[in-house]
Every structure is written in structure tokens, then in C-alpha cells.
UniProtKB/Swiss-Prot annotation:
This is 33 kDa chaperonin. The gene is hslO. Redox regulated molecular chaperone. Protects both thermally unfolding and oxidatively damaged proteins from irreversible aggregation. Plays an important role in the bacterial defense system toward oxidative stress. CDD domains: Hsp33. Keywords: Chaperone, Cytoplasm, Disulfide bond, Redox-active center, Zinc.
Amino acid sequence: MGDKIVRATAANGGIRLVAVLTTDSSMEAKERHGLSYLTTSILGRAFSASLLLASSMKVMHGRVTLRVRSDGPLKGLLVDAGRDGKVRGYVGNPNLELDLVKTKQNQYSFDFTKALGTGYLNVIRDNGFGEPFTSTVELVNGNIAEDLASYLYHSEQTPSAVFIGEKIQNKNIISSGGLLAQVLPKKETDPLLVSLLEERCKEINSFSEDLFKSKDNLLSLIKNIFPDIDDKSISEKARTQEVRFECRCSRQRSLNAMKMLDKNELKDILIKEGKAELVCEFCKNKYLINSEEIKEMIKN
């Protein structure tokens, strides 16, 4: 079916619902970066979180950057997601493996708290004009969902519920995604809507399992929580959107980055290496800059 975003509203337009599937994007990141299953899960969660945030931006070229700076062995992460559904990202320590921990449900789970440690979640919203909006909150527990909910509560003062999860089977990520439920700004003071949101979300015992059982049917996933969604409140075109891992790097951008170097640095590269190879942090694509191109940079 492929990764996607599905949007809906409920309670006569008072509650906004967004579900995202990031299974394929997570697996592509795993292949590109050589991620462990722990870091694949963490990056997949960050993909879901950033896409959920970007989904509400008013312009198609709007982007959200989600960065974690922390003292855990993961060594941080950075994700860039667009309103257009394109996402990319990387973690500081792609090969990280940790022992599983037992959950309250007597099951085993990745130790996200230990992986990320203590630190901060930084969110940048860029509409492509004016100054980007930046906000930083402390990490709650490193599972990304609660960290994102904390950001929404402290930075946007919007009653929200966030669910993010994944399921791994036979050495594959078989489902990865998230769900965001928000009381819309004009309705946020309505205590009945806030109570409705809280009550419906209490019914979710294991989002990862619910996501897997939905078999990629995100609308069905949403309806399990809010069966009375407003089908006609969002146009068919805006309701479902493709999501994919896609990087914005290019050879020209690599050349431009090289041109930022001091001429003495360029001369040093030319003498010692005779060429330069630039590797994109987001997707691991490699760009070779030959000696003639470096000489031209030095001349100019």
C-alpha cells in the first residue's frame, strides 16, 4: 500500500485527527544508514512525529525540523519533514543496541529512555517566509510520542493526544506509524470536547498492536477511536496523502558547500587527496568533486 497520511475531523469539526504510516520510510532509512532495529524504531517514531506536525501546515512547502539533543548513547537525532509528505533523517549512533525492557503489560520493548537519556526536543516550523518558529522542551521519557505531546502542551497550548508505535517481526519493521488527535484552537476551551478526547484516547491500550491490526487502513484505525468522524469535512484530495523517504540533497548543493571552504582548505584537499567525496548525512548519497572542479573553486 505504501506510506501515507490520512486526515479526518470529529465532533462536528471540533477535533482534528491525523494518522500516518511510516513503515516503508523507516525500512528505507534502515537500509541507507545501516540502522539497528532499536535505532530504526526510534527514527521511525521521529518520522511519524515530524510528519504529524507538518500535516497541519497551511502551505505545501512548509517544513518541520525535529531535533533531539541528549546525553544518551543514541547521540541525538535530526529529522526533516514536509507538508508534502517527504521525510528524511538520521541518528547519531546508528548501530546502537540495548537490552529489551519489560513493560507494565508484561511484554518486552526497546529501552527508548536509556537510548535517548536526558535532554531536549527542539522543533522548528518553517513556512518558507518570515522567521521560522522555534520551540524547545525537555524530553519526557524518550519514546517520542509523550515528548511530542509535551511540546504541543507547552508550546502550542493545544489539548492533544499523541500515539506512535511500531511492530517488528522476522527481522522486519512490519508496521510503523502514529496518530494525533487535537481539539482545534477555536474549540480548545470547550470542556466537553476535551473530556471526549480524553475518554476516547483512554480506550487505546496498545497503539502498536492497533496499528498492526488495521493492516495499513488508517481510516479504519481512526474510526476505531472516533467512529463518528465527519467524512465530508475534508476534501477527498486533502484526506489522503502519500508519504515517502526523499532527500533534497544534490550534486549542485555539494558543490555549493565546497565553495564555502577557505581557499587554503581547498588547496590542502587538492594537494593531499586530489578530489573530494561528500556524503549526505540524511541519506548517505555520495558526491565526488574532481580536481578540475576544485581548481575552478580556488580560481574564483
